[in-house]
């Protein structure tokens, strides 16, 4: 209910007043607010306008703000929701602790979807009255910058005015940074002045200045990466104690890149490839342990591509760092510019933008994406360039494998959620072989096939096309069962091995029991071609899906005797490709 009210008000003309506060308050209703604040502060501290930077923290802010002030501010700013919030906040809230009932008469209610918005509106007038050249807040965390006298005066004003509405600064968590442009004697006086107002304020240096979890100066990046390597190593050791599929799934979607995305977008980590290399090597070692395979250099390069380009989706930090940073700057540049233009302090570009753009142009691509605000647009260009370089050096079976793996749907199994209950769990042996075939790495030792006696190399391709192997029949049955179940789930009953034959006496694989199109029943015959079979490599190394296309044309020709009585469809798949349909 509250979410609906909030969205309705914020999208109304009255919401314009609320959105105007985003210049100083980026803590609610602001897409990319944290990133914009970090980029703006990094730009500001590198300008001559920055003498000091003050980080403020409010103690227990949401639970302490005066409710009368909160409601009065709401009544003046957004009267449309005043009556609704009055019902929520005019009486003390009941908090339960075991069997005890505690009445809470101050602060926003715990779990209130409107909590961040109404808290920000409560302190909005105070924030706008400040005179510092840099003035940006994320809810109760404020950052002020400029000359020391103005920032100090704002600190005194905040301390006094916040006290009037029930808020108190937590000086133990407040931090003061003094620019290198300030001489040592002046710096000592500045520190003393701030200590008189905030006795326990911390004086920090470049290597410890962080904003909203992101380092501001380059000096703070190496310690952060060292800490991240240690933490990821601890996580990685635990992954080896669970199933391979679960471990790979967690690694791709929960660890490393997902945890690093915010930092990659906020910080110029791409400038330190020598520091990123240990993380990439740790990732490589971990995936080798999970899948029980060993990567060649080409296989590792392919594995770190997105799934849609033939990889495993386990991205390297060094590959994602620059696209993520460039996308963040372009997507938040307007907001960051508004934060900086709120004062006459800066008329410069966002810090590191030119350097990052030059680094991009110095790479394999000389073009910028048409949609620079989207990270995938940058990543697509880099990934396509990497895939093309792999294709340029690959020949024969390797090229056919790469083309097949980079086709749509061929890597959908890598998105499967590891759940035995839903039938999407992949056992360790199957996962190892599937990944090995996709990447072209050894999956077995050289030996002779137990079924036909043929030589089998370490890549294991023989098992995909062995005419004596048991897997060929089960694979064909599984294909037809999938088709039949798909039709039945769509309300089209179907049967396998119908009572119709072609001229040589052979039957198709299946048929619908009701008309499919223009009064005719659907008849299908499935086939699976080996992408890397010697007879198909000349065509599959030039065009993905060529083997399935050839087999489908053959099927259509064989069943042409059915004439117009049935709607015949050939269903062709490849061992390393997705499905094709030929009517």
Where are these regions (language model features)?
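Short cysteine-rich clusters marking metal-coordination/redox-active sites
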Residues: 3-6, 449-450, 466
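C-terminal recognition-helix end and immediately following basic linker
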Residues: 1-25
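Short, conserved micro-motifs composed of acidic
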Residues: 149-151, 156, 160, 168-207
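Active-site-proximal segment of RNA-dependent polymerases
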Residues: 26-56, 60-64, 281, 306
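Conserved polymerase palm-domain catalytic core
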Residues: 43, 49-155, 172, 178-180
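Basic, alpha-helical interaction scaffolds
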Residues: 123, 194-270, 328-335, 339-340
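Extended C-terminal regions of large enzymes
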Residues: 279, 295-435
